[in-house]
Amino acid sequence: MGAKCCKPVSCGMCKKTENTLIDYKGNPILLANEFTVLTDTESEEEGMADLEKPLLEKVVAKCDTEAEKKLPCKSKK
């Protein structure tokens, strides 16, 4: 419903750009000013994986020791 209402208003007010967003007061919204451009975060994700690895190793070690405590001990004959 909002898109149907805003499109005729934006086409009538600003002929320079076809896809202009208009707020409820009729002012054009420039997305470049409102939001920052997303950058490639691949290197950050790789860095996080390096940080998570030691934590996972600690969790696995803790689970292994708890599992050993629950198992019955085998006696040597």
UniProtKB/Swiss-Prot annotation:
The keyword Coiled coil is assigned to this record: no
Location(s) in or outside the cell: Virion tegument; Virion membrane; Host cell membrane; Host Golgi apparatus membrane
Keyword Phosphoprotein annotated: yes
Biological-process GO terms, alphabetical: viral budding from Golgi membrane
Transmembrane segments: none
Coiled coil: none
Principal location class: virion
Membrane topology: Lipid-anchor
Residues carrying lipid (N-myristoyl glycine): 2
Family matches, as InterPro entries: Herpes_UL11_megaloV/roseoloV, HSV_CEP3_betahv
Keywords assigned by UniProt, alphabetized: Host cell membrane, Host Golgi apparatus, Host membrane, Lipoprotein, Membrane, Myristate, Palmitate, Phosphoprotein, Virion, Virion tegument
Domain of life where this protein originates: Viruses
GO CC, alphabetical: host cell Golgi membrane; host cell plasma membrane; membrane; viral tegument; virion membrane
PTM description: Myristoylation and palmitoylation (probably on one or more of the nearby cysteines at the N-terminus) enable membrane-binding and Golgi apparatus-specific targeting and are essential for efficient packaging.
Function (record text): Plays an important role in the cytoplasmic envelopment of tegument proteins and capsids during the assembly and egress processes. Also participates in viral entry at the fusion step probably by regulating the core fusion machinery.
Subunit structure: Interacts with cytoplasmic envelopment protein 2; this interaction is essential for the proper localization of each protein to the assembly complex and thus for the production of infectious virus.
Family the UniProt entry places it in: Belongs to the herpesviridae cytoplasmic envelopment protein 3 family.
The protein, known as: Cytoplasmic envelopment protein 3
Gene source species: Human herpesvirus 6A (strain Uganda-1102) (HHV-6 variant A)
Gene: U71
